[in-house]
């Protein structure tokens, strides 16, 4: 049986790409408390512009090239439906707003879990160039609350500061983790460099 489809936003009312975004079926290690209710578990539909997606995201640029099946279908039919699985729809909608220059819709503050989720999606969809000053605004309220002792939250800070290119913060939390961790650093399924985690290649 197909999952229920919920209508999301038209980030471009005349867009030629329909993005069918489905949330993760299981909690991720980096946000174990994030559970999707039956109401939230359905697919969310977003309308977007292939031009904006391709310019903003290396992931979509590759996926929409005419050499690929999706790109060929777009060229042939003038529109396409793309599945975007295992993706938090709310965070993805924020990135779509940034990609489509809808900055009035972008929040200036987010929860820490939302900050981590946004970093995960920015890293995956490779859309760093559309962020502007938003990461600094999102991070600033949480800096003073970060832990002084190594824990799982330290690992999240390593990832967030790395993705959002906060070099001073990255150096601080990375040194803390390397200095205080007694074994390999548990990455919580985040793509953190092996040079930091201590794992051999």
For every predicted segment, state its role:
Residues 59-76:
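Cytochrome P450 catalytic domain signature, combining two hallmark sequence patches
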Residues 45, 52, 83-87, 107-110, ...:
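Short amphipathic alpha-helical molecular recognition features
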Residues 9-15, 19-24, 29, 143-201:
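Acidic, serine/threonine- and proline-rich low-complexity regulatory tracts
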